[in-house]
């Protein structure tokens, strides 16, 4: 195998002794990752962009010269986007209540994930990012804290905040701030799922308006996927939670679930997930491990599309789904074909929003991201095992950024 120095630099292995690298190759990914984290002692760092080697350098970068930039911003706060790095800075903000499949592990324990996200922002979007882990579960306190710091940022990425609090936090911040705010667990997952579905439907020759879609999981991701697909033209959607099919009029539902209950399950089907799956064309799982049986897949329509996205263990093993007759399968894991991962979304999405000088990220920009991702797989390349570009395909991130920028300009969300 050719040794890729650039790849080693990206993941930090150039800091590790060759003997340690060899030892890592015998471990599983969790062991490898833990060992690497011990060696790295952090995945991001801050570096200066200007020289400070002489008295003149110091006088220009800092005192006394810097005061002139301060006065310019004092007279016009918008100039903070021109005279500082604010314009290109996007924090990854969490309270640590819904981290990966680990749940409520606390803000400090979520820090490795947030650092990793910051690495991806820089690597694929050239966006300066850092973690902000808030030690509070109080919705109002979190909103207030973020608003107090917002003058330092060009955008905000919310991450791993539990449902339903995440809905109010994002909605309020979008209403009260004039920079892009994006909850990736909701919309990033929805965007990449739609991209995968756009290309999968080409292969099975079906229209989104004609198919029956079942979503298992009524948290942040499931509800966002549901609303996003409905907006894109889906007509027949059923969403399930742990108790079964969500139906309008159920008083036990939270506010967000009640909203989607009015938009879905038009035939008023009652029962469990197995009942919902009968005759379905598409299954999308954002729930928990092993919640789908072989029999459920067998009960689906011909040429079924199955996206079990739960991590690290999917709703059904892809091999089992294939045996049961699933025609196209996509998971959240890199171990299988068709990884449906929101890494394809957020770097390019924010790059496009920032480059357009957008004050928000609207639905049209998110749809543009989905269609941009889908377009990166050519007609000749498209197959049952290749419906999405790889997350590390830099051309895909550039395409997303350009598509989002054009949508922002077209829909008039540019700051005056």
PLM regions: where:
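Rossmann-like adenosine-cofactor binding region
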Residues: 258-328, 334-335
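General beta-strand structural signal in soluble alpha/beta enzymes
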Residues: 131, 157-160, 181-184, 215, ...
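Solvent-exposed alpha-helices and their adjacent loops that cap or buttress functional pockets
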Residues: 38, 81-86, 122-123, 148-150, ...
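Adenosine-phosphate binding glycine-rich loop
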Residues: 184-185, 308-416
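N-terminal ligand-binding/catalytic initiation module
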Residues: 24-181, 407-414
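Glycine-rich phosphate/diphosphate-binding loop of Rossmann-like nucleotide-binding domains
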Residues: 100, 105-125, 187, 191-284, ...
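Short, Lys/Arg-enriched N-terminal segments with co-localized hydrophobic residues
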Residues: 13-26
């Amino acid at each position: 195998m050719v040794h890729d120095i650039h790849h080693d630099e990206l993941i930090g292995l150039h800091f590790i002794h060759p003997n340690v690298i060899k030892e890592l190759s015998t471990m599983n990914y969790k062991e490898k990752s833990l060992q690497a984290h011990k060696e790295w002692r952090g995945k991001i760092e801050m570096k200066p962009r200007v020289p400070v080697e002489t008295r003149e350098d110091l006088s220009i970068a800092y005192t006394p010269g810097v005061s002139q930039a301060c006065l310019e911003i004092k007279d016009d706060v918008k100039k903070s986007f021109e005279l500082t790095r604010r314009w290109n800075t996007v924090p990854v903000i969490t309270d640590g209540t819904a981290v990966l499949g680990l749940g409520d592990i606390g803000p400090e324990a979520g820090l490795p994930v947030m650092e990793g996200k910051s690495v991806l922002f820089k690597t694929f979007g050239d966006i300066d990012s850092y973690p902000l882990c808030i030690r509070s579960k109080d919705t109002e306190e979190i909103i207030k804290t973020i608003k107090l710091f917002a003058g330092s940022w060009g955008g905000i990425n919310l991450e791993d905040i539990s449902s339903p609090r995440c809905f109010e936090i994002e909605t309020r911040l979008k209403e009260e701030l004039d920079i892009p705010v994006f909850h990736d667990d909701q919309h990033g997952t929805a965007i990449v799922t739609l991209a995968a579905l756009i290309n999968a439907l080409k292969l099975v020759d079906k229209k989104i308006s004609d198919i029956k879609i079942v979503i298992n999981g009524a948290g942040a991701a499931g509800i966002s996927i549901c609303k996003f697909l409905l907006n894109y033209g889906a007509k027949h959607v059923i969403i399930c939670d742990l108790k079964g099919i969500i139906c309008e009029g159920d008083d036990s539902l939270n506010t967000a679930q009640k909203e989607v209950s009015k938009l879905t399950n038009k035939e008023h089907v009652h029962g469990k997930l197995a009942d919902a799956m009968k005759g379905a064309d598409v299954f999308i799982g954002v729930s928990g491990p092993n919640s789908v049986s072989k029999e459920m897949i067998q009960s689906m329509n011909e040429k079924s599309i199955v996206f079990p996205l739960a991590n690290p263990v999917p709703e059904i093993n892809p091999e089992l789904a294939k045996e049961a007759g699933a025609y196209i399968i996509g998971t959240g894991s890199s171990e299988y074909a068709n990884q449906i991962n929101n890494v394809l979304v957020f770097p390019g999405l924010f790059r496009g929003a920032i480059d357009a000088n957008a004050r928000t990220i609207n639905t049209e920009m998110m749809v543009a991201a989905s269609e941009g991702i889908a377009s990166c797989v050519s007609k000749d390349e498209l197959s049952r095992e290749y419906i999405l570009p790889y997350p590390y395909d830099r051309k895909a991130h550039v395409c997303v950024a350009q598509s989002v920028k054009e949508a922002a300009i077209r829909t008039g969300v540019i700051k005056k």
